[in-house]
Regions:
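Membrane-embedded alpha-helical bundles of multi-pass transporters/translocases
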Residues: 2-264
């Protein structure tokens, strides 16, 4: 239903179309489907990445990472690494609101959220490969330096993954002002996220054993097999994050603009 406006009110309105959401041009059906597909694909890799970063990284640490280290020392290092991961996860509870505020206050010509898909996807992927290589073999050279650098790398990795995750779910209101369309994006992201998270569980053993056999001649899991797993997951992470970054479009709204102005 259209509402007539006086010429004076029309001149004062920042949106000539009279849409309170601030969206002037509606996307075509093809554009909508493309953006939905791009957004949905994003959480496929994001959830797979998270499973590799949490569940399977611990498996890698406890089974392969310290295989060339003296057994007694390896046991201590495993306990130390797993404890550090738990501490970092707890700290993340308090850090996430700050990261969310940083994302929401980002202002670029590409939008608030898409830049973090690009940056977060790239940085977290590179660092995931690093931790799945034992920091490029440093674990077998100097365990003290390995622990120090591991803490730094894992914290940065976790931060940039969180930036990607926060921006992914936070961008839904910026993609569409329509409540039904938002629910579609949420449902698609949840659905593909389930596929990605559980899918990595299906492929992890074949990937690790196949690449272990290629490089060692044995089907037993090895460093090379887990490194290959890390690289494949990282590539999937970059591909899906960049698909969101380049395949979606943020729409600035009048309400958000007013909120920004009131916050200044």
């Amino acid at each position: 239903m259209s509402v007539s406006q006086s010429p004076e009110s029309e001149s004062q309105s920042p949106n000539p179309a009279g849409d309170e959401s601030g969206q002037i041009n509606r996307p075509t059906k093809a554009e909508t489907l493309r953006r939905r597909a791009a957004y949905a694909f994003g959480n496929l890799g994001q959830s797979a990445f998270y499973n590799a970063l949490s569940t399977y990284f611990v498996v890698y640490v406890t089974s392969v990472l310290f295989v060339n280290v003296e057994k007694a020392l390896a046991t201590k290092l495993i306990a130390l690494i797993t404890s550090l991961i738990v501490i970092i996860r707890i700290a993340e509870i308090f850090l996430d609101p700050l990261l969310g505020n940083l994302v929401d206050n980002t202002n670029t010509r590409f939008g608030r959220f898409r830049p973090w898909q690009f940056i977060g996807g790239l940085v977290s992927a590179v660092l995931l490969v690093m931790v799945y290589t034992g920091l490029f073999g440093l674990v077998n050279v100097n365990q003290t330096w390995f622990i120090v650098l591991f803490v730094v790398v894992f914290i940065v990795l976790d931060v940039f993954y969180s930036m990607r995750d926060i921006s992914y779910w936070g961008m839904i209101p910026a993609i569409s002002s329509d409540s039904h369309e938002r629910s579609v994006y949420t449902a698609l992201g949840t659905f593909t996220g389930s596929i990605g998270y559980n899918g990595i569980t299906i492929v992890v053993v074949p990937i690790v054993t196949t690449f272990s056999f290629m490089f060692t001649g044995s089907r037993a899991e090895s460093q090379s097999g887990w490194t290959a797993f890390g690289i494949i997951t990282a590539l999937l992470g970059i591909l899906t994050a960049w698909t969101v970054a380049f395949g979606t479009k943020e729409n600035e709204s009048v309400l958000r603009s007013r909120a920004d102005q009131s916050g200044k």
